[in-house]
Amino acid sequence: MSRTRRKKRKGRVRPLRLLLVVFVLTGLLAGALWLLYQTLDEKTVIELDAGHDQTQPGYVSDTLREADLDMEIVLGVRDKFAENSDYVIQLTHDELTDMNMTSRLEKIDKDNPDLTISIHTYEDPYLRKTGTLIVVPPSGSRKSISAAEKICASLQEAGRGCEVVRMAYEAGREGRSTVRYLTLEEDYPSGAESREIFSVDSAVMEIQLLNMNDTGDAEQWTDPAFKASVIDAIAKGILSIAE
């Protein structure tokens, strides 16, 4: 009789032990997933965008296209973070994919990164200087403004001029918006006309990087050392954001 009772008890105990093991394993798995989520959540997600599509890329010099230079700078900045596990670097498009501005802005809105840096090399006809526009959405975010200031400080330290400007939208038809460039305190230099671009419903902040060359000599972008200094300064500015 006693043996039969023991067998029955054993039969009851085994399912309880199994449930206990399942409960413990579930708890451990949940803890591991939470730690993984926390680790990913702590990473800074940065989206790099090479401006200008291939339909109207423009030229920085007689032989250097803006679209090619933009991509070269973007890839250079990305490579700086190849072994840095604190950052997740995404691209709106690569050198094999061509996307217009509207599509790229829509992707940025969908990805919702912590910071977006969009490179637009150009020669400003009003300021008679060559430089780069870095677009950091969303405008009004304290984090975006702080990031802009730190990247500018890094570029100024490297001897590159930098000015933070805000883009003011005026709603237009058929998905177009007229844009006025504004500094944080006053209007963009007099004489600069409003510029029209495609846009989506996202606020944008721009950093205008000027090389302080009053002659507007765009040929310096063909100098590998000059391009490397700009890439290094942008990367250094990004790293300083977390400090």
Task: Describe the role of every protein-language-model region.
Residues 1-16:
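N-terminal Lys/Arg-rich, disordered targeting/topogenic segments
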Residues 43-63:
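Short glycine-rich His-centered loop
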Residues 48, 70, 234:
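Conserved hydrophobic/aromatic pocket- or pore-lining residues that grip, position, or stack substrates
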Residues 60-82:
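An acidic helix/loop motif centered on a single conserved Asp/Glu
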